[in-house]
A protein has these predicted regions:
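Sec-dependent signal peptide recognition
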Residues: 2-9
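Residue-level signal for inorganic ion chemistry
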Residues: 39, 171, 283
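Structural signal for hydrophobic packing residues in well-ordered secondary-structure cores
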Residues: 29, 36, 60, 64, ...
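Acidic/His- and Gly-rich active-site-bordering loop/insert found
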Residues: 19-125, 130, 134-152
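Metal-dependent amide/peptide-bond hydrolase catalytic core
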Residues: 236-340
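Hydrophobic h-region of N-terminal signal peptides that target proteins for export
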Residues: 9-18, 28
Length: 340
């Protein structure tokens, strides 16, 4: 982790003229790096961001914001009113991933917890949310210090459960834009390993894709591994489904139209000599266009059904395709805002 990452991210949220934001960022960097290391070493899974939210709330209050906690799960909202002017929203995510850290960093996470399914999992900030939160707090500190240089209302949002495509929806359902000032513009960032440190990228138009989560329950007829002819093996069927799904993007989606179909989880069986009754697949889908999203989902349903039929599955054993209602739309950056 290089301090310049934090500095570059912080300056993205600042567009001030009379003062020197860079000098304030440099002043704040030592304490921000300490905060980053603390957050990195203590990650929490989606919907369990208790201590993380408490740390961010404490930092926002120290910067002079009025903070509301436990808003939409472990979400939080900080408000700094500074006279008449536009309302600007700055957002960070809070949650981490069930990933084992192997960086060897002195502040590496050693966290291991039970997930919502009761499984023991390692936890790591592997998607940069620790950097996002640190930049977020630095932005709050600097904007608070420079209140004589701007007018308006600053809304700072800590979004829980971003990795599960759930937290933003929970905050909206809780009345985010009816209980707090509605923003004229929203600013956020995402760190990227594709960019050199010390650089900031701004994308006009589509920047981040739709996100859909799809579960597939592949059913079978269990039995003994020595007598597979007496059952219907869902592991074999699930394997055929995973391979067939790879044709959607490569052979059905127009080249140049971004799309992703990834099978990220497959679970089934308990012992080497037992054919299970069921295998579960978990997929993530990404796209920009509504018609592409629709095509991906329809193709998954078609392929799953066809593979099951070719395996001789009876109607009552057809796989279930479950598309989550918590779909996240694509992020579209207004070109006129990007050029300011």
């Amino acid at each position: 982790m290089k301090p310049i990452h934090l500095a570059a991210s912080l300056l993205l949220c600042l567009h001030l003229q009379a003062a020197d934001p860079a000098a304030l960022v440099k002043e704040q960097l030592p304490s921000l790096v300490t905060l980053y290391q603390q957050l990195h070493a203590n990650p929490e899974l989606s919907m369990h961001e208790v201590e993380t939210a408490a740390v961010i709330a404490r930092e926002l209050r120290a910067a002079g914001l009025e903070v509301t906690e436990k808003f939409g799960g472990h979400g939080l909202v900080g408000v700094l009113k500074n006279g008449e002017g536009p309302t600007i929203l700055v957002r960070t995510d809070l949650d981490a991933l069930p990933v084992k850290e192997q960086t060897g960093a002195p502040y590496a996470s050693t966290k291991r917890v039970k997930d919502d399914l009761g499984r023991d999992v390692d936890v790591m900030h592997a998607c940069g949310h620790d950097i996002h939160m640190t930049s977020f707090i630095g932005t709050a500190r600097v904007l608070s210090r420079l209140r004589d240089q701007w007018k308006g209302t600053l809304i700072m949002i800590g979004q829980p459960a971003e990795e599960r495509v759930l937290g933003a929806r929970l905050m909206l359902r809780a009345g985010l834009f009816s209980k707090f000032p509605r923003p004229d513009m929203a600013l956020a960032l995402h760190c990227s390993s594709d960019m050199a440190h010390g650089t900031v990228g701004i994308v006009e138009g589509y920047a981040l894709a739709n996100v859909d989560s799809v579960d597939i329950v592949v059913k079978g007829v269990g039995g003994h591994g020595s007598m597979p002819h007496l059952g219907k093996d869902p592991i074999v069927l699930a394997s055929h489904i995973v391979l067939a799904l790879q044709n959607i993007v490569s052979r059905e989606v127009r080249p140049g139209d971004p799309a992703v179909v990834t099978v990220g989880s497959i679970h089934g069986g308990t012992k080497s000599n037992i054919i299970p009754d069921e295998v579960r697949l978990q997929l993530t889908l990404r796209s920009y266009k509504t018609e592409t999203r629709r095509h991906l989902i329809e193709s998954i349903r078609r392929i799953v059904k066809a593979q099951a039929e070719s395996a001789g599955m009876p109607v009552e054993k057809m796989p279930e395709v479950i598309v989550s209602d918590d779909q996240s739309p694509a992020l579209y950056n207004q070109p006129e805002l990007c050029t300011k």
